Amino acid sequence: MGKIKVLIVDDSAIVRKIFSEELSKYPDIEIVGVAPDPYVARDKIVALKPDVITLDIEMPRMDGLTFLRKLMKHYPIPTIIVSSLTPKGGKMTLEAFDIGAVEVIAKPGSAYTVGDMSAQLAEKIRAASRVNLNKQNRIVETGAPRIESIRALAETTNKVIAIGASTGGTEALKAVLTKMPPNSPGIVIVQHMPANFTTAFAERLNGICQISVKEAQDNDSVTTGMALLAPGNDISFTASVGF
């Protein structure tokens, strides 16, 4: 199996340099190019045919979300969003997931070391390279029979429903939860997503689902009509069953 070809798209020369240098240390990853904006990225995608793209959201000339829409329509490639840990960044990241992004990582900063960042990003790149975007879209679009099965389960069980979702799973998770009836059993969810982004994700789901969705805290009760989403980077919260 060949190396995973990665294109870095970011208007920050510092971020491009850090990502290129750090990711080049991994023998299974090859940085085939960098681009300061979507226009340069467009040409490099055609010429270099990367397996994975890392994409900054806030860029001049064309923002990352607009570019991602065009990319997913004409040349779908597994894309990792590089976002700031701000409310605006979180909101735009969730919109990017709706469009088709498969992963997110926070921009390098004081929250973690460059070494931590590079290890996390390398893992996300490996996971993203295995995502079949065409298959993923078919599952979301044609998943009605499976959703009906889940609804039947919700109406017949008095147990807790546990859901685990990894890279590329946000849209499938949304498709499942929006079909859950208000009287469904309590649900616990682990979604592969960094800290600081799960709060916004839970709030977004809560606004579109019949059930209540919130980011879990220790000692929360798992009750009927409630879904608890594990905080990012933490899958070990403690909850009590309270039907």
What would you call each of these model-derived segments?
Residues 2-7, 13-20, 24, 28, ...:
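Conserved acid/base catalytic micro-environments in cytosolic active-site loops
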